[in-house]
Amino acid sequence: MAVPKKRTSASKTRMRRSHHALAKVNVITDAKTGEYRLSHHVCMTHGTYNGKKVITDNVNTNDNNNNP
């Protein structure tokens, strides 16, 4: 079984783990609502992306589905 000959110093251990840190989340404020949202993602309150409507509101004016 492989065993290290010398003890790894704290400096070497920390240098090895230097890239293990979590990346910061890219959060921006929406220009229209002022709410926080992820960058390059659709605004879920209005369904817009880059100033254009990409998610339509599915409002059913015909409520025949609920009647028996």
Curated annotation (Swiss-Prot):
Keyword Ribonucleoprotein: yes
Xref: InterPro entries: Ribosomal_bL32, Ribosomal_bL32_bact, Ribosomal_zn-bd
This protein's encoding gene: rpmF
Source taxon at top rank: Bacteria
UniProt entry tagged with the keyword Ribonucleoprotein: yes
Transmembrane segments: none
Short name of any one Pfam family annotated for the protein: Ribosomal_L32p
Biological processes, Gene Ontology terms: translation
Keywords assigned: Ribonucleoprotein, Ribosomal protein
Record-given protein name: Large ribosomal subunit protein bL32
UniProt family annotation: Belongs to the bacterial ribosomal protein bL32 family.
MF (Gene Ontology): structural constituent of ribosome
Any one annotated GO CC term: large ribosomal subunit
